[in-house]
Amino acid sequence: MKTIHLNSCESITKLPDLYCPNLEKLHLSDFKNLNKVHESFGFLEKLKEWNLYDCSQLQILPSTLMLKSLRFFRLPGCSRLEKFPDIHPEMKCLNHLSLNRCGFRELPSSLLYLTGLASLYLSDNSKLTNFLVGANKSQLREEEDIPSAKLRLASNSFNNFSWPTGFLCLTWLDLKGSPIIEVELDSWLQPDYFPVLTRLDLYNTGIVTIPESISRFTTLRQLFLTNCKKLREIPRLPQSIRTVDAMNCDWLDRQSSSRLLNQVSLSFSFSLKFKL
């Protein structure tokens, strides 16, 4: 069996130990009473896609993921899921990680092993205040060549917030509605940390200013700031930018607005509404 695709199975509360060594796709959605996934699902070497959509009672995943072939892992709407599994160093193929609307309070430092990650979605995680908990290069396997294992540790005043300097393949970072964005952006929003970032979603967050470092993101093309009610200042943006959405940023100052308007070109999509 290579594919399992099931919807709305309310009678299932646990995924038991299944012998499916050839499983490549596992799609489960709207399992309202699913609470636990057996450890064996963390060791399916041929699994490429794993989706757990809106499993609102899910609380327990395998403690460790060693899914060497996994490329897509999606957990949107798993609102009671508070602990994310540790990542094995051999999980280098994961390209897309969607953790929208989950219950995570923190994410482990082993995410640094996901060196092929291109898209990371953390939107609407209202409880997420610590990212890469315990992040310390000495905690990672020293024999591994991990580009993302260089760390930038912020001060303790930011709730032990830390960020890696090497999500070297990440092109899309989605943090909309997330409280972790309330730490000072300039402590982690640096081009060396995300050298190929093309899209940054910060809308509906409590940010006040965008750091000057944004101008050095030479690959950034899209910036979304809608409903950032506290946002007051946006510096000059990189020449690569093509889309800015700053609708309903009620306190954005006139200088920022004028600066953005001066950057507008024929290939520049721009939405702006600011307080007069």
Tell me the role of every PLM-derived stretch.
Residues 1-158, 164-184, 188-276:
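Predominantly recognizes leucine-rich repeat
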